C-alpha cells in the first residue's frame, strides 16, 4: 500500500535544545493559521504527546523504532496523518542519540531513515555566533544520508538571525527556517521523568498562544510546509486487524495519577471490539458497571498516594474485581497501585510487597521481555519489546518475565497469570498485536463467565 503523507521531523542537537518548545510553537501557529495538522513523537515518551494533543485537539502517535518494524512505523504515521495537510513529528534526545553512547539504534535519525521523513534541525544558538555553524557542519557531515533540509535557531536574537541565516544557506545549502527567541515566560517545568504533564500546566493555552504568535513572526511556516510536502509517499503493508466477536467493556483508569497510555494502543483495542470506559481511582467511589476488563496505565501514583489511599472504596472495588478474575493489565504506576502500599500509603493490596523511592532512575530504558510462562497476554517464550522509566521500585517486582537490555544486562520482572499482567515494563499493543487480541478475548470470556 502507498499513501501520500506530507510530513516533517523536528530534530534537536541534544536534549534541552528546545525542540519541544519549538515543536509546540509550530503546531499552535499552524493550527491558528488554519492548517490541518497531525502530530507524532519519536520514541516511547508519554508526556510530549499530551502537549501535542492539547494543541491540535487530536491524539499524537508514538513512532518508536525499537517497538515497531518498518511497516508498523509507516502505517501509524500514515493513519494518524490521513487527510491532514502535514504531520509534524517531534524527535527525541539529540538527532543521532540512540541506545548506548555509541549507537544510533532507536534514535530520531533512525525514525527519519525508516520513514523517509525530511528533517528540520533545532539548534540552540543562545550566545553563539560562528560556533553555531560549526555545530551544524558536524550534524550535516556525521551521516551522508542525514535528511536535514532546514534549520531553526532557538534562543537566537532578531539582530543575529539574518547574518547566521545567510551564512547557513550559503555554506551548507540547507534552508534557514527561522528562529525562536528566548521566552522565559513560556518555559515548561520539568520533574524527574521529564516535563510535567499538560494537565498540570494551569496557563498552558496562554503559553502556547504566546509561542505561536512569536513563531508566526520569526519562523517561516510556509518553508516548513514546503519541506513537509517534499516527503515521498509512505509504502507499507498494513496490519491485519479485525474485530472478531461481540464488543466488551474495558475500564481504563484516567486521571492525573494514571495518564500514561499510548493512544494508538487504546485505538487498537477499540478496533478489536472494546468499548473503553474511563474512570478515576482518585475520585470515583467504585468501578463502572458491567466491566469485562481493566486497564491501569502508568503515571504518577506516588504524587497522589495520600488521595489514592483515602479513596478506600474504589481500592476495595478494584481488589475484589482483580481477585475474582477480571482480566487486568497494569503497567508501571498501575502495577504500583496493585501492591500493598506506596511509601506507606495503602493501595489495592492485590500483590504482595510495597513500593519505595529508589532515589534514581531504576532499570531505565528499552528491554526485551521473554515470557517465562503461558499467561493471558503472552505464551511462554514469546518476546516483547518494552520500556521502563521510573524512580520508584517494588519489594516484589515479579518474576514471570526475563527482561534483557541491549547491553546484555538482565533481570526478572512482572506478574503474568491467566487474567493478569502487572509490572513496571510498558509495552505497545501495536508491537504485540497478539497480546491485544488475547486481552480482548479474555474480556469476552469474562463477559460470558456468569451467563
Walk through the language-model features, giving the residues of each:
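ATP-dependent carboxylate-amine ligase catalytic core
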Residues: 2-21, 27-115, 119, 123-147, ...
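A short, charged/proline- and glycine-enriched loop
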Residues: 3-6, 243-249
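Beta-strand->loop->alpha-helix junctions that form or flank phosphate-binding loops
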Residues: 41-42, 176-184, 275-283
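C-terminal and late-domain segments of enzyme folds
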Residues: 112, 217-218, 244-246, 258-268, ...
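A short helix->loop->beta-strand "cap" motif at the edges of active sites that frequently abuts
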Residues: 117, 174, 323-327
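Internal gly/pro-rich beta-alpha loop/helix module
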Residues: 129-242
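Phosphate-binding active sites in nucleotide-utilizing proteins
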Residues: 246-323
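Cysteine-nucleophile active-site neighborhood
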Residues: 301-375
Amino acid at each position: 500500500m502507498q499513501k501520500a503523507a506530507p510530513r516533517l521531523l523536528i530534530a534537536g542537537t541534544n536534549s534541552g535544545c528546545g525542540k519541544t518548545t519549538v515543536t509546540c510553537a509550530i503546531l499552535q501557529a499552524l493550527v491558528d493559521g488554519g492548517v490541518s495538522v497531525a502530530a507524532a513523537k519519536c520514541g516511547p515518551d508519554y508526556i510530549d504527546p499530551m502537549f501535542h494533543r492539547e494543541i491540535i485537539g487530536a491524539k499524537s502517535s508514538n513512532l518508536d523504532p525499537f517497538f515497531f518494524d518498518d511497516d508498523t512505523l509507516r502505517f501509524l504515521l500514515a493513519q494518524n496523518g490521513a487527510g491532514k495537510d502535514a504531520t509534524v513529528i517531534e524527535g527525541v534526545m539529540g538527532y543521532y542519540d540512540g541506545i548506548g553512547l555509541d549507537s544510533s539504534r532507536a534514535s530520531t535519525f533512525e525514525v527519519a531513515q525508516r520513514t523517509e521523513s525530511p528533517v528540520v534541525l533545532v539548534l540552540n544558538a543562545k550566545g553563539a555566533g560562528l560556533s553555531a555553524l560549526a555545530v551544524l557542519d558536524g550534524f550535516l557531515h556525521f551521516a551522508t544520508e542525514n535528511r536535514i533540509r532546514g534549520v531553526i535557531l532557538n534562543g537566537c536574537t532578531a539582530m543575529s538571525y539574518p547574518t547566521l541565516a545567510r551564512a547557513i544557506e550559503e555554506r551548507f545549502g540547507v534552508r534557514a527556517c527561522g528562529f525562536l527567541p528566548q521566552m522565559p515566560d513560556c518555559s515548561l517545568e520539568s520533574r524527574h521523568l521529564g516535563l510535567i504533564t499538560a494537565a498540570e500546566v494551569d496557563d498552558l493555552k496562554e503559553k502556547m498562544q504566546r509561542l505561536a504568535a512569536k513563531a508566526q513572526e520569526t519562523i517561516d511556516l510556509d518553508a516548513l510546509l514546503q519541506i513537509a510536502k517534499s516527503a515521498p509517499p509512505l509504502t507499507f503493508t498494513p496490519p491485519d486487524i479485525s474485530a472478531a466477536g461481540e464488543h466488551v467493556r474495558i475500564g481504563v483508569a484516567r486521571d492525573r495519577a494514571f495518564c500514561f497510555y499510548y493512544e494508538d494502543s487504546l485505538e487498537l483495542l477499540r478496533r478489536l471490539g472494546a468499548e473503553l470506559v474511563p474512570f478515576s481511582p482518585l475520585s470515583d467511589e467504585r468501578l463502572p458497571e458491567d466491566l469485562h476488563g481493566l486497564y491501569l496505565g502508568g503515571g504518577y501514583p506516588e504524587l497522589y498516594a495520600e488521595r489514592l489511599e483515602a479513596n478506600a472504596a474504589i481500592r476495595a472495588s478494584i481488589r475484589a474485581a482483580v481477585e475474582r478474575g477480571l482480566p487486568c493489565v497494569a503497567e508501571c504506576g498501575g502495577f504500583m497501585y496493585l501492591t500493598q502500599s506506596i511509601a506507606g500509603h495503602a493501595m489495592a493490596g492485590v500483590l504482595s510487597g510495597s513500593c519505595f523511592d529508589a532515589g534514581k532512575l531504576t532499570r531505565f530504558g528499552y528491554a526485551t521481555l521473554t515470557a517465562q510462562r503461558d499467561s493471558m497476554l503472552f505464551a511462554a517464550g514469546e518476546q516483547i519489546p518494552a520500556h521502563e522509566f521510573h524512580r520508584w521500585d517494588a519489594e516484589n517486582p515479579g518474576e514471570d518475565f526475563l527482561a534483557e537490555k541491549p547491553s546484555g544486562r538482565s533481570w526478572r520482572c512482572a506478574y503474568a497469570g491467566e487474567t493478569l499482567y502487572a509490572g513496571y515494563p510498558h509495552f505497545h499493543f501495536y508491537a504485540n498485536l497478539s497480546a491485544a487480541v488475547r486481552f480482548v478475548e479474555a474480556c469476552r470470556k469474562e463477559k460470558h463467565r456468569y451467563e
